[in-house]
Amino acid sequence: MKIVLTADNHLNYYSQKFGAKLAERRGYFGRAWWETIEFAVKNKVDLYLCAGDLFDQVMPRNPPRAKVVEGFRKLKENGIRAFVIGGHHDTPATLSEGATPHNILAKAGLATVFEDVDRFSSEVLEIDGREVCISGMSTDRRLHPGMDPLEGLRIPAEGDFNIALLHYSIVKIVPCGEAEPCIRLSSIEENRDIDIFAMGHYHQRISKKVGSSLVLYPGSTEHNDFGEYKNKTGFWYLEVEGDEVRKEHISTSCQPMNRVYIHTSSLPRDQIMPKLIEEVKKASNPEGLLQLVLKGDLEFEHYSKIDFLKLAMVGNESNFYFEYEDRITPILEGFEHSSSGILEPREELVRLGEAFIEKSQGERDKEIWRRALELALSYYDKAAMEGRR
């Protein structure tokens, strides 16, 4: 039995920061996902499993929907059975939001879609003379942080070989955020008749044995953000013979992505801008995405000479997309921050601003701090007024 397991394809990807380049960025997501279809057909697999977040949104545009229909039709024409669940991005939070975007696949008879979020659905197939049970449950976005989605549930295991599709983090296997529900390891252990847990949600590939069960996360097929720039994108290809599962992680083509960290201690004080521009150009790729992260302490007189506008211009000229993250702590000689008593935010803002103005050397620096204080107070007052409405 041959299987392709994919997840977190995030078709119809959306990020406001790409502006006019969003369509081109989306193209990378679409092409990476399409590689899973072509691989499945070329290798004549028996099963194509999508463990959630095929789409990036509950209501994707028509072009990616049409491409998905084309892909799953290609699978069906080649005798490949497809099974899909919804993930955090493409499962409606409530019934009022409508059906999942995968519903069209079920209606067209192109895939079995397990849409229920609070109970398992299953189907038993005969493959190579064995009964294979595929079960799945879409993500329940109503669950509170810390809740176990499998609590009180038994996963169907009605075959000689059993596979379960889920889209959650599993405690002690992948990081679990404080604001999300997580499957306890004991829930995996209690469902020991499941041979493969085909998982989505975590964007790194994972292969982990829990008792007799194999837990597999394929990771995403394209990088979503700079926090993932080191991840290997792709999907799992599995060959099952008897109780043996041979697995191979197949890489997908992704848009080049890089993140560069520069600490202020490495910056020559008389050549800060030339050094920053040199590092940006060295890390650039005309087709890629680059993030520059600046961190460390820096004397205010040197910090004020960093031309962030020029940095952005050089970065954007040299890359498909560029951004910087300013984590530098400006140090003003003779100023020491201290706090005591009950903090009054607006008063503290004024006190800090006036202190920086007083300690500034030269009228230019003083004017910069005056303007910064005015802007900060205007934003604060606006937010305070909106909060009272």
Protein language model regions, located:
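Acidic/glycine-enriched edge-of-secondary-structure segments
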Residues: 21-27, 56-57, 133-136, 254-271
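Short, internal active-site loops enriched in acidic
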Residues: 55, 89-90, 296-300
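Glycine-rich phosphate-binding loop signature in dinucleotide/nucleotide-binding domains
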Residues: 40-44, 128, 156-158, 283-286
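Accessory, non-catalytic peripheral segments of nucleic-acid enzymes
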Residues: 242-389
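N-terminal active-site segment of His-dependent metallophosphoesterases
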Residues: 1-67, 71, 363-374, 385-389
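His/Asp/Glu-rich metal-coordinating catalytic cores
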Residues: 2, 47, 58-73, 77-226, ...
